[in-house]
Amino acid sequence: MASPLLPTSTTPDQLPGGDPQLLSSLRVLLSRVLATVRHASADARPWAELVDRSAFSRPPSLSEATSRVRKNFSYFRANYITLVAILLAASLLTHPFALFLLASLAASWLFLYFFRPADQPLVIGGRTFSDLETLGILCLSTVVVMFMTSVGSLLMSTLAVGIMGVAIHGAFRAPEDLFLEEQEAIGSGLFAFFNNNASNAAAAAIATSAMSRVRV
């Protein structure tokens, strides 16, 4: 008499069609992005300070306005970037077609190039594409999406509005002694913030997968 079959459980990495390397890369990328978001949230200043009406005044000169922008960005940079990110998200949500194109482009880069195992060539319609051909197709697709559709103009116009808003707020908000000395040693600049947080977080996960694609 045959023994009864016992129920078995399957871990997520053992699901049919699941790629452990892909799942691991996605987990690393997601964890680093979440860590970056938490770090940015921890760096954010109280929003009441950002909109304190008593701290606003007209700058007496252009040099003073420039100095205010630099100091305010150094202090409120996490708040500013959060607001610009929200503005970008809202702009994309109000343009579903642009959001679909941008999401499809990002997914193509992730799943067809960065997270695709190096020993599994891309096959479409029975044709095998090399890494160089795949990279060329993705680059061409990026150019088409960014410069021949509404995605590029939408992103650039939204960023321009966000940066203009940051500049106006920074120029008219008089810096307070509370944070002048505290932030004097911190280098100002949008690229420095992204390089130390978001770029390092996403690049670390993507670079690990991309380096595995280099064939001897």
From Swiss-Prot:
TM segment ranges: 83-103, 105-125, 135-155, 159-179, 186-206
Gene Ontology CC entries for this record: endoplasmic reticulum; endoplasmic reticulum membrane; Golgi apparatus
Single GO BP term: vesicle-mediated transport
Localization: Endoplasmic reticulum membrane
Membrane-topology annotation of the record: Multi-pass membrane protein
Keywords: Acetylation, Endoplasmic reticulum, Membrane, Transmembrane, Transmembrane helix, Transport
Subunit structure: Interacts with PRA1B1, PRA1B2, PRA1B3, PRA1B4, PRA1B5 and PRA1E.
Protein name from the UniProt record: PRA1 family protein B6
Species this protein is from: Arabidopsis thaliana (Mouse-ear cress)
